[in-house]
Amino acid sequence: MDAHAIEEGRRRWQARYDAARKRDADFTTLSGDPVEPVYGPRPGDTYEGFERIGWPGEYPFTRGLHPTGYRGRTWTIRQFAGFGNAEQTNERYKMILAAGGGGLSVAFDMPTLMGRDSDDPRSLGEVGHCGVAIDSAADMEVLFKDIPLGDVTTSMTISGPAVPVFCMYLVAAERQGVDPGVLNGTLQTDIFKEYIAQKEWLFQPEPHLRLIGDLMEYCAAGIPAYKPLSVSGYHIREAGSTAAQELAYTLADGFGYVELGLSRGLDVDVFAPGLSFFFDAHVDFFEEIAKFRAARRIWARWMRDVYGAKSEKAQWLRFHTQTAGVSLTAQQPYNNVVRTAVEALAAVLGGTNSLHTNALDETLALPSEQAAEIALRTQQVLMEETGVANVADPLGGSWYVEQLTDRIEADAEKIFEQIKERGLRAHPDGRHPIGPITSGILRGIEDGWFTGEIAESAFRYQQALEKGDKKVVGVNVHTGSVTGDLEILRVSHEVEREQVRVLAERKAARDETAVRGALDGMLAAARSGANMIEPMLEAVRAEATLGEICGVLRDEWGVYTEPAGF
């Protein structure tokens, strides 16, 4: 790009920066020297390929979505938490908010993730152990007791039963007297990643996609600030993928949901701003930064050039980041504080919109209160003490970072071509029921391609660890020292017994005729092809449980069986 074009871009950026609201903060170094909000080529310099880098807040958004970077608003500290029953988790949320957390992120237990009630025999021994147990709207009310849902943003990592759980959230807000139009947060409705990596689905893929489409329509019409579809790469990376695979599979899943919205006749400029993303921040510092920068650039280009998005907000890739649980070790667990800090810094330098930092004890148990507080303080030290929020994309222009960004983008584009090719094999006439990327994803799920590719990457990494080619301190190098015992959080089995007892009381107290009628109405909607959200809300209002709602739909739609593979 020639010097004139670069200066034109700088002037556009400056005008937008000047017009934007900034935080009241001291944007100087520790020595007192002022720092610019962004850095770029010197006036008069040329820079080949600068149009791919650009300025913050301008297409292709490599350097961030906003002209101010974090000077306008810092990332949201959103700590993932949930254990035991709703009352216990409510107390943890209040602790997080009181300690300076900016939002909430709900971790659900395994029965809830699988759409089962706490009294289901298959739930025995799992209730409240890896997250909070939620059986009905009454539990959701307790979960957010004394936390005004109109004032706090809430993320829910739930996937399979995402739609009925979100209906419980809406009913809890209703009972607080909160207008659904002001609710803000994200819902991890992404079902593709369940078939690809996490393996916690409920139905066949097509009914899941139908529910997601219903929710997209419903939220676009009445809950504009809420992001009804968070597309997750985190679970893909934690399953063993490479950074490029995480990026490509996640963005491809996002493109699939865009095709789903378009197939429903929705306006891309209306529904696409409701999509958000969830990425892993692994320990390879510069590769992670490059991954985040490439993600914004790829998404913007595809949304504009492939799917016809005209508004900037429809081209924006907003993402939450969680530090890499898979990078943490049970050996010498205090080292995990350092790993998490490095990963969090990579996420911030990559421009994350919100961040969860893992606790040092998560390889051993759910985080203790002390470990959770250290994880929270890690972000606060980065935000308040280091100056990393003063300059937008401070590594932009680095030869290393720019080449890494280009490389990971090119690797992702190759994977997109592989996915499209699989879609063409499924529909050689080019008549895709939803869209070409969606066809490729469904074909890759059905024949086990995604799972096989991730397994191969995980195997190669494990081989490198065992050979010593990849070093992990405390595991295969520097293994000698002992760092002391940790206080471990243990969820009592009494929690399960109490949850089952309360569930029985609530079932006994409800109007069974109303419950049966609401479930029948939901089933009728499932059979007719009508939008499922209002009938599901009626079932939730009648105190139908999660297991009952999901059970009706399982019986109607069937359960997916994964293909065997070695």
Annotate each language-model stretch with its function:
Residues 73, 119-122, 150, 192-195, ...:
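Short acidic (Asp/Glu) and glycine-rich catalytic loops that position anionic groups and cofactors
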Residues 165, 169, 253-254, 277-303, ...:
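Extended, hydrophobic alpha-helical segments in both membrane/secreted and soluble proteins
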Residues 1-282, 287-288, 306-309, 313-320, ...:
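Catalytic alpha/beta active-site cores
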Residues 101-102, 145-149, 171-179, 213-225, ...:
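Generic secondary-structure signature for well-ordered alpha-helical cores
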Residues 11-46, 55, 59-61, 110, ...:
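Flexible, glycine-rich loop/tail regions that form catalytic "lids" or insertion modules at the edges
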